[in-house]
Amino acid sequence: MHILGALDIPTSGTYILDEEEVQKLSDDDLADIRNKKIGFVFQAFNLLPRTTALKNVMLPMAYAGVPSEEREEIAKKYLQMVGLGDRMEHTSNQLSGGQQQRVAIARSLVLNPSLILADEPTGNIASAQAEEIMDIFKKLNKEGHTIVMITHESDIAEHAKRIIHIKDGKVFKDKKITVMGLGILGRG
């Protein structure tokens, strides 16, 4: 996941993202890729606890240089998309786990990344909320986003178009599923 997210550079082989060899890029270029082309969704949400949902979602746009007058409008759009239009002014510690994860998903989308990396995004939430998160990911995938997700939950992995099982750093099973609408990387 760290290599896919351009957080680590591969020591062998080639990683090409949007026609660029990642291992040949400068630190500044890698930071730019992480900010603009990749959306990250973490198991622990990584929200600022005393900051509103709206401001948490606006934060990546500040780093990307999006004009301040546009940030709020864009953040509101994505919070409404994940069903939190009525919770925008709540701080993250006033939100349920599922709501916090939806804020994290909205935050990952505000710069319209082509790749979304989700590390155990349903691991800390109730099963009903996990299904809501998977529905959001399916919708995003249908809109053209590539979703790579790590999960240990087989019922969550069943939402995938493809499941890759990795054990001890090696692929031991690669299964394509033709019914669903999401690409997932699983770890077993």
What residue spans do the PLM features occupy?
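Glycine-rich Rossmann-fold phosphate-binding loop(s) that bind the pyrophosphate
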Residues: 182
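Conserved switch/coupling elements of ABC/ABC-like ATPase nucleotide-binding domains
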Residues: 168-172
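A short, basic/flexible loop-to-alpha-helix module at the beginning of a structural domain
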Residues: 176
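N-terminal Rossmann-like dinucleotide-binding module
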Residues: 188
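ABC family nucleotide-binding domain
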Residues: 1-166
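Hydrophobic/small residue at the entry helix of a nucleotide-binding pocket
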Residues: 185
